[in-house]
């Protein structure tokens, strides 16, 4: 089994490390691979789209032919986790800023996002979050973070902060406005791993 982390831009090594630690804790044998070009996504049982700069990420995913592969994987039910910029990339609709930059979003989650929901006013901060899938609060690390403004009926809201949706799930797709890979708390990566193992 392979779990792939999109590695063309963004916080890659932290996700790779968190996934490897989560696998070890679960006692599961699997390979965590970095996806830098076309052809790797179809081999993966789970895909992580990390943070970074969403405009650049969208452009590189399209240019490298990875965007279409992710859409196909999502349609087949492969679990996908998008964090921070990844939350923007997987959305169906962006705000005016996203539209202005001409970002081609993957549209695999029925959400409308605000690219700089927590960004301009406070560049980075931590907040204790109540997350529906966890039994105790999770420390969310927010770095110029986006947020989900609205979502379709098939999307389950998992957490809110200041009225903004910061975690959501739609079937096999999980979106987070924060960076779980920047904490020592592996519960969200373990939850994602369970989705991979059960799909």
From Swiss-Prot:
Keywords: Glutamine amidotransferase, Hydrolase, Lyase, Pyridoxal phosphate. Its EC number is 4.3.3.6, 3.5.1.2. One of its GO terms (biological process) is glutamine catabolic process. The active site is at 84 (nucleophile), 179 (charge relay system), 181 (charge relay system). It catalyses: aldehydo-D-ribose 5-phosphate + D-glyceraldehyde 3-phosphate + L-glutamine = pyridoxal 5'-phosphate + L-glutamate + phosphate + 3 H2O + H(+); L-glutamine + H2O = L-glutamate + NH4(+). InterPro entries: Class_I_gatase-like, PdxT/SNO, PdxT/SNO_CS. SUPFAM superfamilies: Class I glutamine amidotransferase-like. One of its GO terms (cellular component) is cytosol. The keyword Hydrolase applies. Pathway: Cofactor biosynthesis; pyridoxal 5'-phosphate biosynthesis. The keyword Lyase applies. It comes from the Archaea. GO terms for molecular function: glutaminase activity; pyridoxal 5'-phosphate synthase (glutamine hydrolysing) activity. L-glutamine binds at residues 52-54, 115, 143-144. Catalyzes the hydrolysis of glutamine to glutamate and ammonia as part of the biosynthesis of pyridoxal 5'-phosphate. The resulting ammonia molecule is channeled to the active site of PdxS. Belongs to the glutaminase PdxT/SNO family. NCBIfam families: PLP_synth_Pdx2. In the presence of PdxS, forms a dodecamer of heterodimers. Only shows activity in the heterodimer. This is Pyridoxal 5'-phosphate synthase subunit PdxT. It comes from Methanosarcina mazei (strain ATCC BAA-159 / DSM 3647 / Goe1 / Go1 / JCM 11833 / OCM 88). The lineage of its organism: Archaea, Methanobacteriati, Methanobacteriota, Stenosarchaea group, Methanomicrobia.
